[in-house]
Amino acid sequence: IGLCRTEHMFFGADRLPAMHEMITAETPEERKTAVDKILPMQQEDFEGVFTAMKGLPVTVRLLDPPLHEFLPSLVEQSLKVQEMELTSTDPVHTDKERRLLAQVKKLHEQNPMLGTRGVRLAMLYPEIPDMQARAIIRAALAVLEREGETVDLHIMIPLVFTPVELATQRKIVEDCLAEEFDRAGRRIDVEIGTMIEPVTYTHLRAHE
């Protein structure tokens, strides 16, 4: 697989509530609780991919799109909150939807494709690449244990603009892999890299 895009794994009906919980979390602890709910689901997905590939190369791209793609539209969520405020809806549930609306407004961007996505998203929410790295390597080790098949694994850090961004995210992934290898008592080779997409970074590298 030249590029296994992980964002589609988050759109399932059993995953979106956890994504909303993560997005509206007010503390790192709350955010980690939410992503921990997603981790076993991601691991199961990756185990399926790795099993099907039978040792062929798989490049997994960490979460790339902006968070607003996982949220309802501003109009949709505004109408939902208004309706709840006009009816006798449970106040706790109403407050939860208000918090979601606040995040929809906060994450709204004029050009989200060049905004808070890819590596920038990972810098703001390091719990996401941490969770994904653990899910990926746990899945690879599980397939090795169960099938005796070593995964030819490559992890891509998305939409990098600067060397510092790449180094920061690479360290997060490497630290997670080291912890998981120690926990499992075995290891596999993993290649970590990026696709240099932004024109600015490409221009800078070309003139180094």
Question: What does each model-identified segment do?
Answer:
Residues 208:
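A short, basic/aromatic helix-end/turn motif that makes direct DNA contacts
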